[in-house]
């Protein structure tokens, strides 16, 4: 296998790896959007509780308002932790994607350089062959 073929194979592998990383990034972005949406709903529920103090919730009539507000606060903290973790994960994925782009670019540069080197060698060989044939022919 020639050096160019090995570089093409490496480039193809890096491109496939980047595709997988892009899918992973898309999943992380969707997960983060979902968590943010849940947090928004939670904040809206908290505001609703704050706007009607003293009432009991029909679905949670056994709970006092303060207990429910405390539960919402606890869930909010947990959601915030998940959002922070998912944001960190997304940042790592973006860093990996950037590294993969640099590696792919580097491999492509090496492949182009090797291809050019092979073309120059082929041209030199053809010129030498032409010179050799010209020297053989009588004038």
Enumerate the language-model features and the residues they cover:
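Charge-rich amphipathic alpha-helical interaction elements
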Residues: 1-139
